Amino acid sequence: MRVCTFLFAGILCAQTPAKVDFGRDVLPILRQNCVSCHGPAQQNSGMRLDRKSAVISRRGVVPGSSENSMVFHRISGSAFGMQMPPSGPIRPEQINVIKTWIDQGADWPDSLANEVELPPLNSKAVAMVEALRTGDLPGFMKSAAADANLLNARGPEGSTPFMYAVLYTGPATLARLLKLGADPNKRNDANVTALMWAATDLEKTRLLLDHGADVNARSSDMRTPLIIAARRPGNSSVVKLLLDHGANPNPNAHPAAESSPLIEAATAGDFASMELLIGRGAEVKASGELALEMAVGMGCSKCVALLAAKDLDREAYSAALPNIAFLGDVNAVKLALDHGADVNAFDPLGRTPLMYAAASDLLDLDVVKLLVERGADVNAKDVHKEGGDSGLTVLDIAKLHGDTPVVQWLIKSGAKGTSPSSPVLKARRENTIQSAIRGSIPLLQRADANFIPKAACASCHNNSLAAMATASARSHGFQVDEKTAAQQVKANVFGLEKLRDYMHQGFFVPVGDLFGPVVVSYMLVGLDAEHYKADLNTDAVAMYLKAHQSPDGQWAYPAADTRPPICSDYIGQTALSMRALQLYAPKTDKAAYDRSIQLAAAWMATARPKNNDDRGWRVLGLAWAGKDKLATQKAMRELLAVQRADGGWSDLDSMESSAYATGKALFALQTAGLSASDAAYERAVRFLLSTQQEDGSWYVRSRAMAFQPYFDAGFPHGFDQWISAAGTSWATLALSQASPARMTMAMKGR
């Protein structure tokens, strides 16, 4: 489930070698981008890409001929179906590596052929892990004392009970287990060791190192303990400990594709870790472009200055500029331009830095002005081919946010638009809450079921929100397709299971993991709505979330994702992550998770919303926290104050009211206790009833800069269907929460 890696991946610093080495150059690309859907767990379209015989025998790869190799065609274009991976194409440099390798004869060493089936899991080891998860430490220790060999036996995903003890117990217990013979260097099926799982905890890391743990062990996904330690905010003490024990600060040949400790420290916005790494020899130029993007995204000015002082290549600044422009940091944009960044360069998706600046919800006029002053073409056209923004000009993109100062200034500067066609909409003339929900649920469930098989991943917009809406409708007496609902729960859990080992390492995607918390938190909230019981998968998400929380209590999420509103939530990520911990925190460390929840609630109480989307999330987060009534009431008043005369809300003040913003705002207010008799409540309900389409959907215009190849998931509204599905889910959630006494409330005429 590689959702967003492409956005943050840079250009490989080294040219494709004359002779491509499979283990060094090809295998990491396959593991990070393909094997989750075409590996031992599942083989989409019958293709398995982790085993030599399966790839060669089915002509996935024809040695010597990329032209006749299906793998090459599927990753390089859409002639044989949607370009793979479904979450977004890999970079041109990586495609060229695969092509060159095939044309050179596809040399795949037998030592990496992966032809031997893994041994079965040990049922006793699996039972020991379950004992740990449920808090039965005495039972676990009894089993270990009876047969110490079980500590090193194959448990879930090949991980040993001792590895799981690293997650669920403390240093004292681990010391006892090591004395019994636990092996700190035993590897699971992904070549992960106990030290990698311990690398976010100083004392556990110290203990394992003292008992001979390999400080430079590397997983199949090219991660080392140091890479994992550097990703956690405020974890510089562990970074230093690992470096002191000989950890390599430059473990990967291609850090822009495989990550590096420096990139992860920048992603965490951790200046102390970055300074340590650079002081110990971390190669700044090799990681510079991506590290620069991450440091700017996290708002760490000291981190940016540290990198800029290292004389990065002009190409690094050029590659980073599009995402930096989107972040609305005029000083960072100036820094990139002053270091030679090409102001008119198209990124691999076919867009210029000015397009990203125009697309940002931050509406930063100073950034737009600076780019134009430095020569940006105000009439450049978006040449991205796989989304609804293809062919749009800079002005078209800016207008997606309404009539803003950015739009007005661009027009004065000579920017031209293309007058994109408006959708043909037909709202219901008569509607009730009951008929509205009965009309929307079948659409949501259909799109929910269609999305995962086509995308090979679960989404917030089509899956998690649909689960929440479906469960809410059911709980209020509406019929839903129970077979589809159960099927989707299984699909979401399977997605988490594939990610479980990633999350134990503290990652959701291989590189640039800024948005992972919002995605997996949505998944847990959706699963809870369907009454899913806690298990190893939900525990892994909770551990991942806890490891990513910043010391001040937030889950830091700058506007670093070009898919507003869903993945650009300043306050929303913290609200959702906190809620996920409330619902699924592991039993074994309740006090620590309670502290994380309290810290998040305190942060939200003082957080300052940047827009209406933030205001809605702040109300919802504080209502979920349930601790600070005064802060919750104040947040409710602030949200109510920006309700429009038509009864709706908009994400931004410059935009029209939408079902997405209105449904979410009303649901937040309902959760916080807004009375159904309140006039604002009634106006919001009437807005939703009056804007539902005859087919049962609500239409929301997308303003996201697409990076995933578009496909039809069976929801109305074409290129705008994914955000429209999300808006329909929020509207359905809000309407289904209406009290029974208001269920027949009707809207007639317009």
Feature roles, as predicted:
Residues 122-127, 245, 280, 304-327, ...:
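Ankyrin-repeat-protein effector appendages
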Residues 150-151, 184, 215, 249-251, ...:
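Ankyrin-repeat inter-repeat connecting loop/turn
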Residues 121-130, 153-164, 187-194, 218-227, ...:
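Ankyrin-repeat boundary/"N-cap" motif
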Residues 130-135, 164-170, 197-202, 228-235, ...:
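Ankyrin repeat A-helix N-terminal signature
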Residues 186, 251, 339, 344, ...:
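Preference for long, amphipathic alpha-helical scaffolds in soluble/luminal domains
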Residues 136-144, 170-178, 201-210, 234-244, ...:
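Ankyrin repeat structural motif
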Residues 3-12:
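Sec-dependent N-terminal signal peptides
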Residues 13-138, 142, 156-160, 164, ...:
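Aromatic- and Gly/Pro-enriched helix-to-coil junctions and flexible linker segments
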